[in-house]
Amino acid sequence: MAEGGAARGTREEQGKLPEQEEEEEEDPQVLLGSGHCKWFNVRMGFGFISMTSREGSPLENPVDVFVHQSKLYMDGFRSLKEGEPVEFTFKKSSKGFESLRVTGPGGNPCLGSERRPKAKTVQKRKPKGDRCYNCGGLDHHAKECNLPPQPKKCHYCQSTMHMVANCPHKIVPQHPTTSQGRYEAEPQPSTSSFQREGGGAFDYSSPSYSQEGRSELSERSSRSPQEASLSKISTSPEEQSRKGPSVQKKKK
């Protein structure tokens, strides 16, 4: 029984330990410090204090302490000026040192910074002049016009004889365009120059054939390869007699 009671006691003690640790974390030790404002962001509302004295004893190296605008003791817009002397209470947290209440020297209100956050500038459209589409007046709209419906006018010269699309006073530069809406390119010559090894250039143009030559080419291309081979084999005797002397000359 004694062993069982001892085990229960150890379990209860172990169960209380985390609770005690939480209570200690919730109630940290409040310390006193003094120093000056290192920097403060007026728009975001926070900054850091450079602590030079802790509990009345000076520090060799200044320590940074976080400060929020809600912890400042002052009236109006709460902020700190860079280099402003302050006194404060602070605590130690998992993120570092955080200030709890910040005042000026001797518990007086903080002076604060002269800077103010800039208001967001909303870009507004420029107000266009109101014009009546019926009579052209600038002090009312067409639905408020007292005149009866007026004839349509050219929006460029206010003439009733034509519309703005046919206005002779409005000059629109026109460029020649193709069917696809692109500008026509200047015609380029069909000749192409080739560079020689010696550095000169000569023009080469496509040969111009007559109608007879084109008909012969079309007939040749329409022939089958078998007909072409037969035409080579079946040559006339006149052609053979013509070729004969030339062959004899070559043999000599």
Curated annotation (Swiss-Prot):
Protein's UniProt keywords contain Zinc: yes
GO cellular component, one term: nucleus
Main localization of the protein described in the UniProt heading: nucleus
Keywords on record: Metal-binding, Nucleus, Repeat, RNA-binding, RNA-mediated gene silencing, Zinc, Zinc-finger
Any GO MF annotation of the entry: RNA binding
Segments for region (Disordered): 1-30, 172-252
UniProt zinc finger (CCHC-type) residues: 130-147, 152-169
Biased composition (Basic and acidic residues): 9-19, 213-222
An annotated GO BP: pre-miRNA processing
Domain annotation CSD: ranges: 32-105
One Pfam family from the record: zf-CCHC
Comp. bias regions, Polar residues: 225-238
Binding site for Zn(2+) 1: C132, C135, H140, C145
Binding site for Zn(2+) 2: C154, C157, H162, C167
Localization (cell): Nucleus, Nucleolus
Keyword Metal-binding: yes
Role according to the record: Suppressor of specific microRNA (miRNA) biogenesis. Binds target primary miRNA transcripts and sequester them in the nucleolus, away from the microprocessor complex, hence preventing their processing into mature miRNA. The specific interaction with target pri-miRNAs occurs via an 5'-GGAG-3' motif in the pre-miRNA terminal loop.
Protein name: Protein lin-28 homolog B
Source species of the chain: Xenopus laevis (African clawed frog)
Name of the gene: lin28b
